[in-house]
């Protein structure tokens, strides 16, 4: 998937694949109905839409993290619920945000039309954490959420983040010379083929960025079932190095 081609596809998809705001709100209400840990917030976009975020404050904060989920999910779904609470437990306050969703029949390529919207959501989430006093802010993103974060870090002139964790990203990286913060690329040895096959290319690119590394979790699949403690350890080890106390 190339972003140059993606621009053309996105123009087409803007007409064929409008965001499903009703589905997004249903996901939000389902999330709120079962929420146990964290505080819900709403962030206001320029067009008037208000999207959900789940803020979990760390008792002894070492940094703050924006968490972005994969295609069609929600900020407390499965892996994302575990990550936002596990990271908060070890000192990283988390803001897990609702990313744009399309109708359930949409394919991954259809989501190219939502990347401008996801850029705005990342910017609002980072600004919100900064306003809460976050001095060191990272993005932790999974699957399509990682692809969206890649786009944000490339095309936003002032992304205002200090590190990026991409978990099981679903394509190769583009224009990495634009990214100036340490990057962790982590995926499973039994991950989706589109993630595994791009691993060598990603490693070659992130080696050019100081403080970056790649971790392959042996035996893990795309959602890291049975390997989430290992995943969390890898993320925390990276964040501790990339976001040193000041």
Regions found by a protein language model. Give the residues of each.
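Acidic catalytic loop of the alpha/beta-hydrolase fold
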Residues: 189-195, 222-223
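Short, surface-exposed "cap/lid" segments of acyl-processing enzymes
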Residues: 50, 56-90, 95-96
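Catalytic histidine neighborhood in serine/cysteine hydrolases
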Residues: 206-223
């Amino acid at each position: 998937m190339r972003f140059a081609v993606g621009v053309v596809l996105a123009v087409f998809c803007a007409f064929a694949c409008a965001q499903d705001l009703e589905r997004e709100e249903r996901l939000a209400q389902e999330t709120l109905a079962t929420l146990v840990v964290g505080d819900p917030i709403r962030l206001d976009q320029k067009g008037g839409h208000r999207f959900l975020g789940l803020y979990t404050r760390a008792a002894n904060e070492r940094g703050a993290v924006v968490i972005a989920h994969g295609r069609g999910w929600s900020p407390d779904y499965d892996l994302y619920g575990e990550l936002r609470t596990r990271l908060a437990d070890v000192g990283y306050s988390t803001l897990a945000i609702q990313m744009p969703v399309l109708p359930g029949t949409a394919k991954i390529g259809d989501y190219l039309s939502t990347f401008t919207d996801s850029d705005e959501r990342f910017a609002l989430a980072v600004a919100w954490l900064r306003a809460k006093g976050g001095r060191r802010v990272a993005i932790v993103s999974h699957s399509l959420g990682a692809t969206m974060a890649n786009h944000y870090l490339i095309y936003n002139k002032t992304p205002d983040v200090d590190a990026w964790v991409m978990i099981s990203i679903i394509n190769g990286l583009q224009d990495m010379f634009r990214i100036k913060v340490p990057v962790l690329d982590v995926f499973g040895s039994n991950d989706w083929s589109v993630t595994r096959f791009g691993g060598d290319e990603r490693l070659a690119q992130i080696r050019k960025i100081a403080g970056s590394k790649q971790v392959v979790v042996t035996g893990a699949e795309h959602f890291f079932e049975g390997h989430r403690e290992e995943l969390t350890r890898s993320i925390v080890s990276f964040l501790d190095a990339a976001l040193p106390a000041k």
